[in-house]
Amino acid sequence: MAENVLSAQKRTEQGKGPARRLRQQGLIPAVVYGGKREPTHVALDPATLLKAIETPHKFNTLLELQVDGASKHVLFKDYTVDPVTRKLLHADFLEVSLDQPVRVEVPVATVGRAAGVAEGGILSVATHEVVVEALPNKIPVRIEVDVTELKIGRSLHVSELKPPEGCKFKFQTDYVVVFVAVPEKEEVAAPVAAAVPGAAPAEGAAPAAGAAAPAGGAAPAAGAAPAKGGEAKGGDKAKK
């Protein structure tokens, strides 16, 4: 991994006020963590930093940070941007030693076309980053996972992956990295028979809107006398 050189100056003032003044001067505050010393507070040019990390490693980019004549090796770890302007406001670095391994997260990239995809399956990446232990200058850009032989319903765990030379995968649980899912079957609704014009409704079914009521038990016409033996609504019983 090639190193990019980044210049910075040490700062003694912290807080919102000094940070605001730095930004007015075209600089941003940054902090260097790690090592056996207290965190180092520095100021640097954001444009220079953005150019320095324009590498495939991005957050795992190894930098040589020069602060007031002294240099140290660092990894770019985190940053803050303005939510409106998207300008860089703050940066964090991790100080490292070139002869001491570090643990970092490295992105996963699949290689090839899974056999299960040809069978109608769906390739899914369950874990997009894996934890790798390596020397700072041996950190891989990505972890390539060959899925060519992966059949439908099968998966690859992190323990089954081959780490790049000089790297180790670190994990407590043997988690799934990629798998080929079985496609879900779509349920087909049963066809509904079309109504035949003029057909009688099924037994117990209500008549269609606007249809005549059945003859049996039909209501009497307006003003007609009730059926024999019946009662007149709202009146006395019929005379015998």
From Swiss-Prot:
This is one of the proteins that binds to the 5S RNA in the ribosome where it forms part of the central protuberance. One of its GO terms (biological process) is translation. Residues 1-20, 204-240 are annotated as: Disordered. Residues 204-229 have a biased composition (Low complexity). The keyword rRNA-binding applies. This is Large ribosomal subunit protein bL25. Belongs to the bacterial ribosomal protein bL25 family. CTC subfamily. Part of the 50S ribosomal subunit; part of the 5S rRNA/L5/L18/L25 subcomplex. Contacts the 5S rRNA. Binds to the 5S rRNA independently of L5 and L18. Residues 230-240 have a biased composition (Basic and acidic residues). One of its GO terms (cellular component) is cytosolic large ribosomal subunit.
